C-alpha cells in the first residue's frame, strides 16, 4: 500500500488520504461549489484510508482465491491515489457527458439532487436519478406542479440553462419547513 502506486514520479512520495486520495484525485476541487469566496472542499479525514484499505483487502482475497484455484501466488498493491480515482469514476463518467467541466457553481448543479437549507437550519438533500419517475412528485411537493410545462423548463437543455432559477424556487420552498418534515414528505413520495 502506497500513496501513489509502485511506479511513476510520485512512487516514493509519502501521502495521506487528504492529499493523495482526495486532492490529487480531484475531489477537493471538483466537489466545491464556486462562489466569490469559495475554496476547495474540506474532506473527511480517514475516509479515503477506509476505501483504500477495503480495496487492498479485496485484492488480497482475490490473490488468495487465485492461489487456491491455480496454486500460484500473486503480487498485490493499491494506492490512495488509485483508490481515489476509482472512487471518482462515477463523477468522471458523468463529466464526460456534460458540456465543459463538471458543475462548480450552485446554479449549474441539478436542482433535484442538491442540498437545501430548511426552516430549522438543517439541510436536506434528495437524489433523483430517474427524472421522469420522481421529479414531478418532488415538484408538486415543493409547490410547483406545472414546472415541467413552463417553457423555460420543458426540456433537459432548457432546465440546464435555467437551473439557477429552479434552484431559487426550490430553496424558497425548502426554507419554509423544517428538515424532519421534508424527510417525511420525501420519504412518503419514495424519493431518496
List where the protein language model places each region.
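Active-site-adjacent "lid/gating" segments in soluble enzymes
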Residues: 1-124, 128, 136
Amino acid at each position: 500500500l502506497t500513496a501513489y502506486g509502485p511506479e511513476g514520479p510520485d512512487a516514493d512520495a509519502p501521502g495521506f488520504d487528504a492529499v493523495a486520495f482526495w486532492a490529487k484525485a480531484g475531489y477537493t476541487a471538483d466537489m466545491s461549489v464556486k462562489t466569490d469566496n469559495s475554496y476547495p472542499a474540506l474532506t473527511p479525514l480517514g475516509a479515503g484510508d477506509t476505501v483504500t484499505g477495503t480495496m487492498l483487502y479485496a485484492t488480497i482475497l482475490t490473490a488468495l482465491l487465485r492461489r487456491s484455484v491455480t496454486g500460484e501466488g500473486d503480487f498485490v498493491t493499491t494506492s490512495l491515489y488509485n483508490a481515489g480515482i476509482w472512487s471518482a469514476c462515477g463523477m468522471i463518467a458523468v463529466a464526460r457527458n456534460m458540456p465543459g467541466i463538471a458543475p462548480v457553481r450552485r446554479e449549474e448543479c441539478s436542482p433535484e439532487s442538491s442540498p437545501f437549507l430548511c426552516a430549522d437550519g438543517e439541510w436536506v438533500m434528495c437524489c433523483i436519478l430517474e427524472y421522469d419517475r420522481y421529479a414531478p412528485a418532488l415538484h408538486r411537493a415543493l409547490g410547483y406542479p406545472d414546472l415541467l410545462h413552463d417553457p423555460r423548463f420543458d426540456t433537459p437543455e432548457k432546465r440546464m440553462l435555467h437551473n439557477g432559477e429552479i434552484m431559487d424556487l426550490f430553496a424558497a420552498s425548502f426554507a419554509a419547513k423544517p428538515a424532519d418534515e421534508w424527510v417525511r414528505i420525501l420519504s412518503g413520495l419514495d424519493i431518496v
